[in-house]
Amino acid sequence: MRGKFLSLLLLITLACIGVSAKKHSTRPRLRRNDFPQDFVFGSATSAYQCEGAAHEDGRGPSIWDSFSEKFPEKIMDGSNGSIADDSYNLYKEDVNLLHQIGFDAYRFSISWSRILPRGTLKGGINQAGIEYYNNLINQLISKGVKPFVTLFHWDLPDALENAYGGLLGDEFVNDFRDYAELCFQKFGDRVKQWTTLNEPYTMVHEGYITGQKAPGRCSNFYKPDCLGGDAATEPYIVGHNLLLAHGVAVKVYREKYQATQKGEIGIALNTAWHYPYSDSYADRLAATRATAFTFDYFMEPIVYGRYPIEMVSHVKDGRLPTFTPEESEMLKGSYDFIGVNYYSSLYAKDVPCATENITMTTDSCVSLVGERNGVPIGPAAGSDWLLIYPKGIRDLLLHAKFRYNDPVLYITENGVDEANIGKIFLNDDLRIDYYAHHLKMVSDAISIGVNVKGYFAWSLMDNFEWSEGYTVRFGLVFVDFEDGRKRYLKKSAKWFRRLLKGAHGGTNEQVAVI
């Protein structure tokens, strides 16, 4: 009897080992030397999401302060970024975390209103803000971490919104140029990678079409409680001004600073990757149009000096602005690298073009969905918009290479969220799976010949996630918002540490290999 029991126990044990091994084998096993020797690994945050100290040391309000504090109902949990991760006061601890994990670089943004509280040079420079960023940059360099700086990550000074409508005003372009030049002057001796704008498409889409993000504008027929707006015209004006602002910032950097500071400058663009809903010709064209209205919307002007033909042919009634010959020339080649922010993929379905209630979204004549025949494109994350589909990052990189003359690329954001369950949770195997599968796809793209130079995980730590507030967590580091903003390394941070030291990554959770 005892022998039968031991035999049964052995069979159960072997079966469990087999299941565990099967799960383990689904995660790619990566080493740092699977990537080029000079490949940069880093992590990323943004100013409003993590700095806090929103009303301290002379910082002026941004549109995100106004949006979240005056209209808390527009944030899922009624929160704001006034304290956030308190990185303004805890930056040394954050730099130590980057060093401890083993990252080469840190991508962060500068709060425009922290150094120019009224948004303009005429309104005065806040020396305390300059000092903060000098201290952060110097601390990073002292730990061997490269600063990779974004100039504008959505937090426009509120003074400019009030003065001329912010991104809707032509004045924005020159004000951004002046702000960018101030940053080049103050920090460019140490900062060698600059990003002008982060995700201009998100600013256009969620700030002026859906109204989900500051300044919260949309058409009344879309959402009656929007703070004004016209989603048929304003998005195109905003996108145009953002492109021109990018162009003038790159121009001043190249003409006055690049030769001596020896840095490089680019832009960070985002999109889901779009797959045809069916094999029909109409749906294949719809997938192309969907990308034209998101990623190509900004790539086409900065590579070729024009808007994508799909936009030109679909946006009626003169609503799509045009570039002057001088503007077109300025925009052509206005990058040393392109940042790619990728999280998820979608199916694109051709639909009839709208004849009423027109928005920039309806102009594309595409319906974007996350499932086909009842089957999601990939497993769901903490946010309903994030369906996990690693192959999309490779296909997006290939698109950038072959349509846009093989540019230098960085993955400037890639990550996954989980719901905030209200207690310390460090065993984030889902996040490890996400990173492993996406990094494998990046490695595959490099082996095909895509010129990817680096990868930044979003995010270094849990932070204020815009309209979702603190209801979801993207971080490699857990932040306890109830206990002094204490930081704890999650399992994913330790996985990265092993990867960056050359060990295989991997535990026993799985995500479908796609």
Curated annotation (Swiss-Prot):
Domain of life: Eukaryota
InterPro entries according to UniProt: Glyco_hydro_1, Glyco_hydro_1_N_CS, Glycoside_hydrolase_SF
Disulfide bond entries: C218-C226
SUPFAM superfamilies linked: (Trans)glycosidases
Keyword Protein transport: no
Induction info: By abscisic acid (ABA) and dark.
GO biological process, one term: carbohydrate metabolic process
Summary of the tissues where the protein is detected: Expressed at low levels in cauline leaves and flowers.
Family annotation (Gene3D superfamilies): Glycosidases
PROSITE patterns xref list: GLYCOSYL_HYDROL_F1_2
Keywords, alphabetical: Disulfide bond, Glycoprotein, Glycosidase, Hydrolase, Signal
Carbohydrate attachment residues: N80, N357
Protein's UniProt name: Beta-glucosidase 16
Organism listed in the record: Arabidopsis thaliana
Top-level taxonomy: Eukaryota, Viridiplantae, Streptophyta, Embryophyta, Tracheophyta
